[in-house]
Amino acid sequence: MSGHNKWSTIRHKKGAADAKRGKVFTKLIKEITVAAKIGGGDPNGNPRLRAAVDKAKAENMPKDNIERAIKKGTGELEGVSYEEIIYEGYGPGGVAVLVECMTDNRNRTVGEVRSTFTKCNGNMGEAGCVSWMFDKKGLIVLSKDVDFEKLFETALEAGADDVADEEEQYEVLTDPAAFIDVREALEKAGFPFESAEITMIPQTMVKLDGKNAENMLKLMDRLEDNDDVQNVYANFDISTEEMEKLM
């Protein structure tokens, strides 16, 4: 499996997705609020907001929650002002880690993120220390129930960079600027998505096993458990055999 989707699969197998549903809602509400603040409250004219709303709907977030978050972003309702920050660092075994945060208290967040790195045998670095190891891409994940040839043809005609046949799924990669066009073309052709988002794809992977693998999973878990953390990207690769030992 490609590394950029490895963690979401691991997390799902660990059963963490449902256990952290409340935190997922909190993070999505923040993203919707900030997206509406920056680009306006109309999802049709605001690609970032549309992506956030689509993700919220996929998580079965109530419509009222979504609408309130948009109104807080546009100023129609009073809400907290969030600041977007990206922290960078190294996990066990030299794994590159990007941590995207939204916070109303920068000092609190940086202290908590730094402490989490340290407790899991990693260390926080300076801005720019690992971001060059990742490429910003659109990623659309589909189940293997769909027709690959039709998917490949439709995606590339719409402007996708690549369509990959991975172990458990198909993955469509796009330039961020082409993401909406490709997603809409696939929707129009009737392809159901498992997920569709703008993400950070690592250029190279670091293979982990033993204690380093165990500590890396702890680091990912604890970072994502922080309410101020929106997304965590890392370039680690753990074999299926190693995962079975850890789980």
UniProtKB/Swiss-Prot annotation:
GO cellular component term, pick one: cytosol
Record keywords: Transcription regulation included? yes
Query: Its GO biological process terms?
Result: regulation of DNA-templated transcription
Family annotation (InterPro entries): Integrase-like_N (IPR017856), TACO1_YebC-like_2nd/3rd_dom (IPR048300), TACO1_YebC_N (IPR049083), Transcrip_reg_TACO1-like (IPR002876), Transcrip_reg_TACO1-like_dom3 (IPR026564), YebC-like (IPR029072)
Tell me where in or outside the cell this protein is found. Cytoplasm
- Supply the Pfam families for this chain: TACO1_YebC_N (PF20772), Transcrip_reg (PF01709)
UniProt-recorded name of the protein: Probable transcriptional regulatory protein GSU1074
